[in-house]
Amino acid sequence: PYVDAESIRYLRFPGGSTNTVSHRYGGNGIMKALKAQAEDKGYHWIDWNVCAEDATASHPDAAQILRNIRRDADGQDTCVVLLHDTKATGQTVKALPDMIAYFREQGYNFCTVAQMDALQCETK
């Protein structure tokens, strides 16, 4: 199903809400200002804390993607995993079954961003 612009309430800042690349173009306070503007317009922004590194120039295979996720998830009670869905990152889809199995084995629960934002999702 398609989503209309009015129903979109969540966003992910390219590079994350604390990225340093934006500072080069908008100055030191740019991300703080962008976060405030998003919130003023009723948007919720979300960051990730686990990165698959699946969109890097090295084009990792499924096994490396899984290792990256396991490394970043270690010690986290709540994991928001950054994955990319592009033609160049076909290995991500191959890694998904093992990622899901890993998180289930570790006792994690799965939920939507809206559930997590409303604190309706149990942590590990």
Q: Where in the sequence are the language-model features?
A:
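Catalytic domains of cell-wall/extracellular-matrix polysaccharide-remodeling enzymes
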Residues: 1-82, 86-109, 115-123
